[in-house]
Amino acid sequence: MQKQIEIFTDGSCLGNPGPGGIGVLLRYKQHEKQISAGYFLTTNNRMELRAVIEALNTLKEPCSVTLHSDSQYMKNGITKWIFNWKKNNWKASTGKPVKNQDLWIQLDQAIQRHHINWQWVKGHSGHIENEICDQLAKAGAENPTLQDVGYQPE
């Protein structure tokens, strides 16, 4: 039987683009782990994606995951849009290249070994775990130490 893991994620950007951060809260039974990281120059959507990638890559074995995020972009992208993007050689319905393709590929790889129940939560609505992740993401954005490799300014 796979471990039942609850994951909460958030991304933040001070300016868009600007310094950004990720916030992650992983919960297994009574154990919790928090992750915060900051990037010098990025976008809010890249931080939302990176938060989920970082969370899933932290898991050492296949798990049954309930993943909570306030990002409709991330949730719709991984549960709806990615199938056509892959079929269309990473082109959006407009014919233009999919933005953040590098991270979508990483996220697609990260989900393969897990069973994931995707849950959208309304941001800034008093959801305790989402608020914790928001604080972690903002702290990362305020103290960036990493390059967002793959970020392509427009």
UniProtKB/Swiss-Prot annotation:
Its main location: cytoplasm. Its cofactor is Mg(2+). Residues 1-142 form the RNase H type-1 domain. Pfam families: RNase_H. Keywords: Cytoplasm, Endonuclease, Hydrolase, Magnesium, Metal-binding, Nuclease. Binds 1 Mg(2+) ion per subunit. May bind a second metal ion at a regulatory site, or after substrate binding. Mg(2+) 2 binds at D10, D134. GO terms for biological process: DNA replication, removal of RNA primer. Its EC number is 3.1.26.4. GO terms for molecular function: magnesium ion binding; nucleic acid binding; RNA-DNA hybrid ribonuclease activity. One of its GO terms (cellular component) is cytoplasm. The keyword Ion transport does not apply. Endonuclease that specifically degrades the RNA of RNA-DNA hybrids. NCBIfam families: PRK00203.1. Belongs to the RNase H family. Monomer. This is Ribonuclease HI. It comes from Pasteurella multocida (strain Pm70). The gene is rnhA.
